[in-house]
Amino acid sequence: MFGQYLLAWRSGVSATSRLLVGVFAMAFVAAAAGAETPSPRIVVGPNILVSRDGDIAHCETMIAANPTDPKNLLGGSIVMVRPDGGSANKAYVSFDGGSTWTDVSFPEEMEHGGGDPQVGFGITGTAYFVGLSNGMNFYRSEDGGKTWSKALCLSRNGDHEMLVTDHTFGPFAGRVYLTDETDVPGSKELETLQMQRRVVLFRSSDDGRSFIGPVEVARGNNTGLAAQNLLVLSDGTLFIPMLEYPNYAINKEASTWKAVFSLSTDGGVTFSSPRRIAEIPFGGVKAMRKSQGSGRVDQMAGPVFAVDPGGKFRDRIYAAWTDLENDRYRLVLSWSGDRGATWSTPKPLDPGVPAYASQFQPMIAVNPDGVLGVYWYDTEGFPSRDRFEISFTASVDGGETFLAKARVSSATSNPFGSGNLRPGPFVSQDRGLVTASFVSGMSRWPNGGDYIGMTAGTDGIFHPFWTDGRSGTYQLYTSAIRVRTDSQPATPAPEKTAASLSDKVTLVFDPIQYDRETQEVLLPVRLKNVSKETLYPPFKVEIKELVHPYSAKAHEEVDVPTILNATNGKTGVGATFDYSKALHDLESLEPEAVTDAILWRFKAASAVKTSFHVGADITGFVAKKGAE
């Protein structure tokens, strides 16, 4: 790059000068060769299983990072977890950057059921959780999500709420905003089929302890109107994107949605009239219903938004959505540099995708360096579109160009397992009857929900938070993704030496499965660094014993399993498992971090006796003393 610059610079000078400059340039480049910084690149970390609460469907995810501690992450999801199999919202909390998680249940959710989870953090680190249950309930936590306040019920009849906090230094810093889709007072949609919907806003100036509202933002004209993810610009201006959708009951031929927005410059007191962003073709309600029952996973979802909070493209607003094109979904992006007054022509993010493939369910975020991250569900490689991978790309130039997409998921999602298809009831009293409406995770949310989450922490790391179907049932996964740019030179790796890591690494198991007919035990095994040292791959696990020494000395009868999938083909002691790819793109395993899960397949000695013992040695590399 520097050499090309010199060639262009010297084009107008004399031959003698060109020779001197050429000699200087070669000397300079030779001297600087060791200091070159890499081109922008995406670095994907291991896939981390977040949910460990059973073979039950998880749908509609959200995630936020604490602005005062980027390792404190808060996620939310609908989970088919109630005692009768119905849905409730749960929170998931991490204090180590997403390596380990703890789940949180809320009493109202477990009693009444719920949906549409929202999460966020206040400007001083207070955690917020919102869910629709017996009302729109707001919860606070002043310890990062460990303990929570009692519910503050803000409304009784709402839908599709959205949450944002002003993290700027503007006049409304710290203000919490919460929108809700609700009926216009006095409307009788069930009787007249005339849709009268509006978006309202609640605001809090005391860290979520109390709210003012609802205040009407906008209303539809016999259409639905739902707020999308809210944004706050650098001066505190509130940007409220909304999706205007047809009244499907009387307009079954309508085939486009309209994305619009309103602004508030006075902290959520008054709002501008809605202005147009784009029209989004979705094919019509008949096409949507047909797609939902087709066995395909690609489905339509609303547009998503992000803003550069203060990087090199300050206040640039980004919008991404899927266009329906010849029965395939194509992910496009548009941006505005003038607070929504004008928008760039939408352009595809992955123009080289095969004609058969769909890109759907996107989410976007911008980190403090101004890097725009985008991830989505991708059916490339699967013409039947009944499974998907997770893809990610990024732009370092304000959405003008994008890096080659990276695969995030370490396994393919094929989400048609029994946990996704098992229906759960919604029980209510209606028209003098006790009714039970049944829905399964897959039938209601074949694409894992109406939306998915991603956040970017103050450390610049992106954290996608997705519903993953590798087990057949939608479970929650995340990964830490870094976008290395020219301003972030790679740190040279220290000189390393091979070592046993068995005193530095432990085994962490994802949920274990067992098939009685085949007697196969499936063990998803991760390595966790429990030392204070950085450890380096490649890592290898070697099975050293399948009988505990005490049992051997005591002549106890033991059940010894057979190993079915060792890397070296051995079926007993001496079998090895290769973890060289378990870090994904990472070059080291930091303290408290975990690898991706590698599946160990064992065959139990008996169909009904599945107790056994394993002793293993783990090897890898450590930095030579004095080399770090």
List the model feature ranges, each with a label.
Residues 526-533, 545:
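Asparagine-centered strand-capping/turn motif at beta-strand->loop junctions
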Residues 1-17:
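N-terminal secretory signal peptides that target proteins for export/translocation
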Residues 17-30:
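Bacterial N-terminal signal peptides
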Residues 60, 508, 517-524, 595-597:
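Short, solvent-exposed loop/turn segments enriched in Ser/Thr/Gly
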Residues 487-518:
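Low-complexity, acidic Ser/Thr/Pro/Gly-rich terminal tails and inter-domain linkers that flank the onset
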Residues 36-491:
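C-terminal PAP-associated
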Residues 596-628:
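Terminal connector regions
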Residues 555-606:
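Intrinsically disordered, low-complexity Pro/Gly/Ser/Thr-rich segments with frequent PxxP/GP/PP motifs
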